[in-house]
């Protein structure tokens, strides 16, 4: 029996909800531990889902939600490759959450961290679940902005402010490169679903250009 894709989508929704809850809970003494405990539970659930998908050698699972571009919606898919990275990322997220339950109490300005940490985890997972160019780029940019917010949590430190500026410039360049790559993959018909892109027969020159753009976009 395949792991339902709803597990991952509900997990992402829970992480986004925890991000919202981080705003009022940051003012409470126990708020830090509550947020990190929540992200720990969600990360372990998604880690288990990814691992089960791999161990059972399940067929790809997919879902389309009535969001995003009107003619394709928001497409999500889990196959063996994405399940592997879901397991890896959520293993790291669970470890970071466990560490944060203790270390987070020393944070002087938790309101600058607690809303963005769960949102960043949600963004990373959404990137792996995305099955169309629009959803991928939206998730990618959301992940980039929330990670930038975490970098800037200690913005009064000069090195942090400079690092945040460099990161934002590089992330914007990366998004532009990925946007161009998806445009080439979509072709003149504008098929932004990944299934449509996979079906396209690209010339060697276009394929090489797409590879270069993806390496630039992901590497930045």
Walk through the language-model features, giving the residues of each.
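Juxtamembrane/interfacial segments at transmembrane-helix boundaries in multi-pass membrane proteins
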Residues: 54-73, 135, 142, 175-220
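Membrane-interfacial loop-to-helix junctions in multi-pass inner-membrane proteins
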Residues: 26-43, 80, 105-119, 131-137, ...
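Hydrophobic alpha-helical membrane segments of integral membrane proteins
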Residues: 6-13, 34-35, 84-85, 125-147, ...
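Hydrophobic residues within membrane-embedded alpha-helical segments of Major Facilitator Superfamily
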Residues: 14-15, 22, 42, 85, ...
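Hydrophobic alpha-helical transmembrane segments in multi-pass integral membrane proteins
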Residues: 36, 40, 59-124, 211
């Amino acid at each position: 029996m395949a792991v339902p894709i709803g597990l991952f989508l509900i997990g992402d929704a829970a992480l986004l909800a925890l991000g919202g809850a981080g705003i009022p809970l940051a003012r409470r003494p126990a708020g830090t531990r509550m947020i990190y405990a929540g992200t720990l539970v969600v990360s372990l659930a998604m880690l288990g889902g990814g691992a089960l998908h791999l161990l059972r050698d399940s067929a790809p699972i997919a879902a389309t939600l009535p969001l995003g571009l009107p003619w394709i919606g928001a497409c999500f898919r889990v196959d063996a490759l994405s399940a592997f990275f879901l397991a890896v990322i959520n293993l790291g997220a669970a470890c970071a959450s466990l560490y944060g339950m203790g270390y987070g109490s020393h944070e002087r300005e938790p309101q600058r961290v607690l809303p963005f940490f769960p949102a960043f985890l949600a963004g990373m997972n959404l990137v792996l679940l995305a099955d169309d160019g629009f959803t991928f780029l939206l998730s990618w940019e959301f992940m980039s902005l929330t990670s930038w917010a975490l970098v800037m949590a200690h913005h009064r430190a000069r090195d942090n402010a400079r690092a945040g500026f460099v990161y934002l410039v590089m992330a914007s360049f990366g998004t532009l490169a990925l946007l161009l790559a998806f445009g080439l993959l979509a072709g003149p018909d504008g098929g932004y679903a990944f299934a449509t892109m996979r079906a396209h027969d690209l010339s060697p020159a276009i394929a090489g250009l797409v590879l270069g753009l993806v390496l630039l976009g992901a590497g930045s």
